[in-house]
A protein has these predicted regions:
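GST-like domain detector, emphasizing the conserved glutathione-binding G-site
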Residues: 1-129
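Residue-level detector of family-conserved "landmark" positions at structurally sensitive sites
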Residues: 31, 69, 188, 208-209
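Conserved beta-strand edge residues that scaffold enzyme active sites
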Residues: 34-36, 192, 212
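GST-like fold's C-terminal all-alpha helical module
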Residues: 103-200
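Carbohydrate-binding/catalytic loop surfaces
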Residues: 165, 212-216
Length: 216
């Protein structure tokens, strides 16, 4: 078995996959892809051969290449079923996917590097306007995530029950991003508590951006 992860230390999507790999105790080799240096290493010819979309993360498993973080996590869950991150029950599975997609599909694309670069370089927004944009969509998305947890009463120590799922692999990086952009996560008490429970686990600790070999 050979697992390689092309990752950027501060990428939320890469962070999700690192958490999933760690929760499953899967060893892997990290290849840093600097999204900021000289316009971004992701646009290089060499990396386009790895991932034609020029995004991170990309997982390579025994020569097979996979991108899109949720697809990667689902692949890992099906290939390495120990410590399941997606429940077997159809209702529970759909709920975990729903929570994951609130973050991966609705929040994060509006705050990723390519979006912020476009806002600054093409639309000529200043830093204050870009930060306001980021905060707006983070708050809207996490408001919805928190409302689902409050309504459904299915969360425990984590987003769905008392063991981490794919939803928590998505939530923790988003809470990190929220704090980075000046959003106080204590406005969502349940999310803050889940974040604390995750932070107590070594799988989440070792996935943290500050612990990555390409951290700056």
């Amino acid at each position: 078995m050979s697992l390689e992860l092309y990752s950027y230390w501060r990428s939320s999507a890469s962070y999700r996959v690192r958490i999933a790999l760690n929760l499953k105790s899967l060893p892997y080799v990290t290849h840093g892809v600097n999204l900021m240096k000289n316009g971004g290493d992701q646009w290089s010819v060499a990396y386009k051969e790895v991932n034609p979309q020029s995004r991170v993360p990309t997982l390579v498993h025994d020569g097979q290449r996979f991108s899109q973080s949720l697809a990667v996590i689902e692949y890992l869950d099906e290939t390495f079923p120990d410590h399941r991150l997606i429940p077997r029950d159809p209702v529970d599975r759909a709920r975990v996917r729903m929570l994951s997609q609130i973050i991966a599909c609705d929040i994060q694309p509006l705050q990723n590097t390519s979006t912020t670069v476009y806002l600054k370089e093409k639309l000529k927004l200043d830093d204050a306007a870009v930060t306001a944009w980021l905060r707006e969509w983070i708050v809207r998305g996490l408001d919805a995530y928190h409302a689902h947890l409050e309504r459904d009463h299915l969360s425990g120590k984590f987003s769905h029950g008392d063991t981490p799922t794919m939803a928590d692999c998505c939530l923790v990086p988003q809470l990190f991003a929220a704090s980075r952009f000046g959003v106080e996560v204590t406005r969502w008490p349940r999310l803050a508590l889940i974040g604390e429970n995750c932070a107590a686990m070594s799988a989440f600790q070792h996935a943290h951006p500050s612990r990555q070999p390409d951290a700056q």
